[in-house]
């Protein structure tokens, strides 16, 4: 897991062209917001969305929510202008769509010298080049684009996301190898709470930091699933206490609830507590 001062349990897409949605997002319980200029904006609204979002970010207060701007691709007529407009914007990262190779980030890095870059991982080629992409020195985060990936694969939806497993795993490995944040793809049936919870739990158990969301109704479940539970926090504290006691007696392992606890378990326990503390600090802010 990447060491984070900021939680990314819930990462909500907001269309950059919708003034009311941009205003409403200021009061939502999202850890991060992706202000979208790409898929969520019609072609004839692209320029309007760019101007509206730029003004909004300059004037509106989004508190401690992490602000990500998803621009249009450099292969479109809007991509370069998007990057020039937001190169010095009040944003925390620029999200690049359809990153298939590390070279896709180079032109962006030159136009946006100061902001961190995030990559949409949503092409078959991107899956195969995930390690190369994750190694780019300007990259700090990855977002799974499972809808576009499913389209490329020609796969059908299954609750277990069998067709996605290889790509999800490759990107997770790459992100963890390079200390990046990585968030899971969207769940399209936003009124299906049971299905959303199951997919959030699957992503959490795989190792994702959080989930991208398409509707505010999904926030509560994502925040709950990707937060350490009281039982997990209690176990982490007991593991640390038991291991420290064992060390004082010259032992390298402890036993908690009939299970061996080694140093690697303590690393995980401390990460659990750090995540809980980061979430508590975010709520307090």
Swiss-Prot record:
Broad class of enzyme this protein falls into: hydrolase
UniProt binding sites for Mg(2+): 122, 148
Disulfide-linked positions: none
Gene Ontology terms: biological process: oxaloacetate metabolic process
Residues that coordinate or bind substrate: 70, 122
GO molecular function, one term: hydrolase activity
Catalytic reactions of this protein: (S)-malyl-CoA + H2O = (S)-malate + CoA + H(+)
SUPFAM superfamilies for the chain: Phosphoenolpyruvate/pyruvate domain
Catalytic activity, EC: 3.1.2.30
UniProtKB keywords: Hydrolase, Magnesium, Metal-binding
Complex formation: Homodimer or homotrimer.
Task performed by this protein: Catalyzes the hydrolysis of (3S)-malyl-CoA to (3S)-malate and free CoA. Inactive towards beta-methylmalyl-CoA and other CoA esters.
Family from the record: Belongs to the HpcH/HpaI aldolase family.
The protein, known as: (3S)-malyl-CoA thioesterase
Biological source species: Cereibacter sphaeroides (strain KD131 / KCTC 12085)
